[in-house]
């Protein structure tokens, strides 16, 4: 978009402009923000970005809603994150403040924008600095409080929490044994919202990269494994001998027991169990609790190739020989940089784009 047009649009967004003119200009900007080129042009004009943030607090619901939708679109583009935070330093504090308001009608849009902004490590670090420990506690309370905001579902708090746990500081908060955070999240593995459910599974998967916490996660204080396996289990019959190896919550399931419907979530659940197999003690505990039986039946049922491959990796871990001496902890094995880069690229290609855009 022509820079001159950006400046012209900016003049229409001023408070003294007629409300209908301001609304039309904003509607045009919303359309522009739907393309990568449009987002690049908008982010090149700091005053326009500041005006958009101001308009998101407009008294006119239609104007405020469109402004929030533009912000969601802008934050969906990782290339725009640095410019957004540099040009609008009040963006994160302002959004977090409004998200905490239990009466905010645009909380879901704000939550989606914050989720977009926290995807990349650099902006996630900025987010955590703005949030503080107290803010993390508030986010958790909001996620766990039924109807915290009657006007919003706040389902994107799940993926937001997942993004924050890509960093050690975020994982440290979730894994704080004095806060019982993990235990509070486990019921949401059965949430009716795919977005929330997937975010919680992703959070747990990220936390399982901390191998020093595996014994605690698998122990009686958390007992994570049955929560991960139950969504992967169907209603297949097992022999009495096999049944006794399964955790109590997975025994004698109804014949019509349904597995997790979303293939991406099934894949993340399998990957989380695989991470728990990184240490020798973890592998022993996972093997002892009938995990192979659940994976065997899942593999026969599964139709999605990427989930089937993840299942095969875990089965190989469960039935394969133990690693040689010195390689018992698989999370501490050194991977050559070129191989690590290739594997990371393949993972990203398999996952696809993650940003949420308003169409």
From Swiss-Prot:
Q: Its domain of life? A: Eukaryota
Q: Which Pfam families match?
A: DUF383, DUF384
Q: Enumerate the Gene3D superfamilies for this protein.
A: Leucine-rich Repeat Variant
Q: Which family does it belong to?
A: Belongs to the HGH1 family.
Q: What protein am I looking at?
A: Protein HGH1 homolog
**Species for this entry:** Xenopus tropicalis
